[in-house]
């Protein structure tokens, strides 16, 4: 959760590194995912830090731009859900409940759905740092996912996995490897930028 302008700048820089971008500004009509992440972080900053009458018009305009670009790209991601270092790999449907909490350095692919179970809006996943969420993965309910986990394509995760550094996949999800091959790739991308 962004609580200062300094944190906003740190989040922006880490997201840029996670996306593998070295440019200073997004290119028009090309860097749409990066623009979406920038708007998401700016909106979180405005909501968390500038919640007064003077900033309401700026917050409203930023929210409208964020929602419009999200519809164009197919993203429905709640504000304050992700930590720094988010990498949205491609355009496509991605749905993340606004109450879900995902740690830093998350890679998420199209078709992913992180949502509430029938228990209510607070019955949502809590996901650790350095997690890879593969295409079409579904995570539901009050579950905890440890750090350094890869979630395979089309996995349906309905129970907690508290062992760090594993790969899970399947319907329902189960451990298929005792290591996380995507973790090294994620760290190389972040450290090389």
Show where each model-derived region lies.
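Terminal amphipathic alpha-helical/low-complexity segments used for targeting or macromolecular assembly
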Residues: 1-73, 181-193
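Short N-terminal helix-initiation segments at or just after the protein's N-terminus
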Residues: 26-31, 73-79, 112-120
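Extended, non-globular alpha-helical segments
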Residues: 58-60, 74, 105-107, 118
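Left-handed beta-helix
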Residues: 79, 84-85, 89-98, 103-104, ...
């Amino acid at each position: 959760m962004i609580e200062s302008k300094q944190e906003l700048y740190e989040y922006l820089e880490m997201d840029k590194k996670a996306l593998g971008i070295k440019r200073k500004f997004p290119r028009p009509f090309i860097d749409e995912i990066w623009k979406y992440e920038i708007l998401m972080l700016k909106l979180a900053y405005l909501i968390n830090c500038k919640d007064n009458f003077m900033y309401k018009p700026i917050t409203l305009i930023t929210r409208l731009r964020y929602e419009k670009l999200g519809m164009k790209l197919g993203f429905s991601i709640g504000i304050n859900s992700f930590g720094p270092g988010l990498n949205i790999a491609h355009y496509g449907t991605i749905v993340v409940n606004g109450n879900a909490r995902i740690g830093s350095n998350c890679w998420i692919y199209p078709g992913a759905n992180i949502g509430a179970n029938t228990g209510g809006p607070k019955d949502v996943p809590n996901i650790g740092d350095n997690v890879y969420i593969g295409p079409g993965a579904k995570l539901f309910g009050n579950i905890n996912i440890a750090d350094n986990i890869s979630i395979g394509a089309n996995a349906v995760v309905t129970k907690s996995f508290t062992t760090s550094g594993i790969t899970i996949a399947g319907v329902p999800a189960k451990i298929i490897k005792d290591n996380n091959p995507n973790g090294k790739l994620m760290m190389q991308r972040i450290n090389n930028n």
